[in-house]
Curated annotation (Swiss-Prot):
Annotated organism of origin: Pseudomonas putida (strain ATCC 47054 / DSM 6125 / CFBP 8728 / NCIMB 11950 / KT2440)
Keywords, alphabetical: Ribonucleoprotein, Ribosomal protein, RNA-binding, rRNA-binding
Chain positions covered by the region annotation Disordered: 1-57
Residue stretches of biased makeup (Gly residues): 21-31
Any GO MF annotation of the entry: structural constituent of ribosome
Superkingdom: Bacteria
Ligase as UniProt keyword: no
Name this protein carries in UniProt: Large ribosomal subunit protein uL15
Subunit text: Part of the 50S ribosomal subunit.
GO biological process assignments: translation
Assigned protein family: Belongs to the universal ribosomal protein uL15 family.
Length: 144
């Protein structure tokens, strides 16, 4: 037996349908597309969300909300992510250098999630009450 002698077991694989290849195939002539009309043509599909001229759902519902521009330049950092920063002083720039936050971020807030394992000095970064208590309990301090 060689690789070129291998073949699947009889009846284990079905032939794929080839529309438009004779009436005996069951998909001859119109090829399962029906007679005339937009969807019988090649490329004849309607846009997603089109409802036949009826006012579409996304235009019937009211607009609401907005995207806050403040969210663009602010970020939240977990306590566990502070371990990625080398050095004892953690600032916004040191977080950027350690790839913890994106380069365009200007303000950061530390959240209580995870653990801080070493004493660090936080410089110019806000923190929640719980995060501040956890950092100070580990021997760290805050500088404005």
């Amino acid at each position: 037996m060689k690789l070129n002698d291998l073949s699947p077991a009889p009846g284990s694989r079905r032939e794929k349908h080839r529309p438009g290849r004779g009436i005996g195939s069951g998909l001859g002539k119109t090829g399962g597309r029906g007679h005339k009309g937009q969807t019988s043509r090649s490329g004849g599909s309607i846009a997603p969300g089109f409802e036949g001229g009826q006012q579409p759902l996304h235009r019937r519902l009211p607009k609401f909300g907005f995207v806050s521009l403040k969210a663009m330049d602010r970020a939240e950092v977990r306590l566990s992510e502070l371990a990625k920063v080398e050095g004892d002083v953690i600032s916004v720039q040191s977080l950027k250098d350690a790839n913890v936050i994106n380069q365009h971020i200007q303000r950061v807030k530390i959240m209580l999630s995870g653990e801080v394992t070493r004493a660090v000095t936080i410089k110019g970064i806000a923190a929640t009450k719980g995060a501040r208590a956890a950092i100070e309990a580990a021997g760290g301090k805050f500088e404005e």
